[in-house]
């Protein structure tokens, strides 16, 4: 694999992304549902795109979340929904949309108690932890992330009650319903104001990081690592798990 000519160099100013332009495009661009590239398209359990080209906007996120609200009972989830976001700028904007739709639909969202980023494994573990001794009112989750995609990209994926990636039967149902809503100009989407949603009883703080880190020694021999007196250097490179290493 060829090494990029800019590998190992500082970011150039001309490569910076325009946050104001991204935010404006996210909130004001309405996708052309006749264009396949602007429809909701689920890949590995989620939808990814850019606000600038009309493939990841507030309309997309709202429609996807309403679709989840419409179908999650069929997927076996009637309890809370765990929400995590990564470090991409669009994730911050989409996070507000997610809470607005969930709260308007009366779905309880468990969010990070200190407003930190939440990596996918932590959301998966939270779902399993919650569901482990329950037979009903099971939880599912949403992770707001385009994974490894560039900084100007956004994404969102759904994890069902199993904690892992959603299967094609689930993603197809969400995709179809979301596109139906988009075709109707999201008239079937329930939303409330961002501030109202955050202050509602449907948004509940949850200690993702503390609980996840505390459970690591149940699967990792921490004493052996300490006794080996290894010196380990970690660079999270802007990943959403960066603060998990500190803790």
Each predicted region: which residue ranges?
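Gly/Ser/Thr-enriched, mixed-charge loops and adjacent short helices
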Residues: 2-38, 134-135, 154-247
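Acidic/glycine-enriched edge-of-secondary-structure segments
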Residues: 46-61, 198-206
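Glycine-rich phosphate/diphosphate-binding loop of Rossmann-like nucleotide-binding domains
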Residues: 58-65, 71, 85-104, 230-247
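N-terminal small/polar loop signature for handling phosphorylated ligands or for N-terminal nucleophile
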Residues: 20, 82-153, 247
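Glycine-rich phosphate/diphosphate-binding loops that line cofactor/substrate pockets in enzymes
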Residues: 65-81, 189, 221-228
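Phosphate/oxyanion-binding active-site loops and adjacent basic polyanion-contact surfaces
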Residues: 56-66, 90-91, 115-119, 205-213
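N-terminal glycine-rich anion-binding loops that anchor highly charged ligand groups
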Residues: 31-44, 48, 71, 76, ...
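Conserved phosphate/anionic-ligand binding catalytic regions in large, soluble enzymes, centered on
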Residues: 37-56, 146-149, 236-244
